[in-house]
């Protein structure tokens, strides 16, 4: 549905050229909620602007619905953009206008008949649960309500792709969760493919099925959320994952184990998906004849799957030559 292949983009800066994107490739399939995560300056916003044709490439290709954007003329590009909705970090609403006017604006600009506009605005207001706010001025709304208006506006053209640029970063945690649930509902009930950028791994954890990690204009890691969370490879990915799944062994636990008379090494056991149902620790005790004490554990839900990380001390006499990590 969305293919970015070997994309390169540079900008002229005060101190010379800035390489915003370097050989970036991603593939978003129909029905995905695909997250692009990275710190500021990683190239996330540039990438998403390429997908809706707001930026052009130096080299590489961007293909949406089988159409290579670089080969389209302006009328063709405008037609394609009608199927792509956009949700912004700072809402981009007309504060002095009503909720109705803001949502209707894309249809007004397209000269859609008034009766059709009324019908569509009513439909999307019901979907985003703002029916009672139709005649309220945007300036009177909360941040979460403003973002719902922004989402409703993006849905008026019946898009099959929704691009979200840090759509929750200006919101409090409770409102963020509500907006993410709404995006998931849009994906599930409307069949809209979502490409979102964020610097919050919790956002990826809650709704994405795939993720690409960006650093300094490059995609350093990409794959299913389960794979990336379960086996992060790049250092920046590990830092992001640790904000959600803390599998680091605290110094206090290491010190506690060192105080014991026996010599122990602290180990991690990681269980993903159906393996959480298996009595692995019980089997270790039975087969190896050792006593295991669980010093710590974390449990996270990832796309209807469970990932558990256990921290436990094991006697040196029963250790393998390498660290235990059971990705079962």
Q: Where does each model-flagged region fall?
A:
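Conserved signature/switch motifs of ABC ATPase nucleotide-binding domains
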Residues: 136-139, 157, 164
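Helix-to-loop junction immediately C-terminal to a conserved catalytic motif
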Residues: 52
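Conserved ABC ATPase "signature" region
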Residues: 67-68, 104, 108, 115-132
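A short, surface-exposed alpha-helical micro-motif characterized by mixed small hydrophobic
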Residues: 204-206
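A short, flexible loop at the N-terminus of ABC-type nucleotide-binding domains that lies
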Residues: 1, 10-23, 73-76
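Conserved small/polar residues in nucleotide/adenosyl-binding loops
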Residues: 168, 317-324
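Short coil-to-helix segment of the ABC ATPase nucleotide-binding domain corresponding to the Q-loop/switch region
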Residues: 97-104
């Amino acid at each position: 549905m969305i293919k970015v292949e070997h994309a390169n983009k540079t900008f002229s800066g005060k101190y010379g050229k800035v390489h915003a994107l370097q050989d970036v490739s991603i593939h978003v399939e129909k029905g995905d909620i695909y997250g692009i995560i990275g710190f500021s300056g990683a190239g996330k916003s540039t990438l998403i602007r390429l997908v809706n044709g707001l930026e052009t490439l130096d080299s590489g290709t961007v293909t949406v619905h089988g159409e290579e954007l670089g080969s389209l003329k302006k009328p063709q590009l405008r037609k394609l953009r009608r199927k792509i909705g956009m949700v912004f970090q700072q809402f981009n609403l007309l504060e002095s206008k009503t909720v109705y006017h803001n949502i209707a604006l894309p249809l007004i600009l397209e000269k859609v008949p008034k009766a059709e506009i009324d019908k569509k605005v009513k439909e999307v207001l019901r979907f985003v649960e703002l029916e009672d706010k139709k005649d309220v001025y945007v300036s009177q709304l909360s941040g979460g309500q403003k973002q719902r208006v922004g989402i409703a506006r993006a849905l008026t053209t019946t898009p099959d792709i929704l691009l979200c640029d840090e759509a929750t970063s200006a919101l409090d945690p409770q409102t963020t969760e509500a907006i993410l649930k709404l995006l998931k509902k849009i994906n599930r009930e409307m069949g809209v493919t979502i490409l979102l950028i964020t610097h919050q791994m919790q956002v990826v954890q809650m709704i994405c099925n795939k993720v690409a990690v960006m650093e300094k204009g490059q995609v350093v890691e990409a794959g299913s959320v389960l794979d990336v969370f379960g086996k992060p490879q790049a250092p920046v990915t590990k830092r992001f994952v640790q904000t959600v799944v803390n599998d680091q062994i605290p110094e206090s636990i290491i010190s506690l184990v060192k105080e014991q008379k026996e010599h122990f090494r602290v180990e991690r056991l990681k269980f993903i998906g159906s393996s959480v149902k298996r009595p692995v620790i019980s089997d270790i005790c039975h087969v190896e004849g050792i006593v295991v004490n669980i010093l710590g554990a974390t449990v996270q839900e990832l796309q209807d799957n469970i990932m558990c990380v256990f921290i436990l001390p094991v006697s040196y006499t029963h250790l393998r030559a390498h660290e235990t990590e059971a990705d079962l």
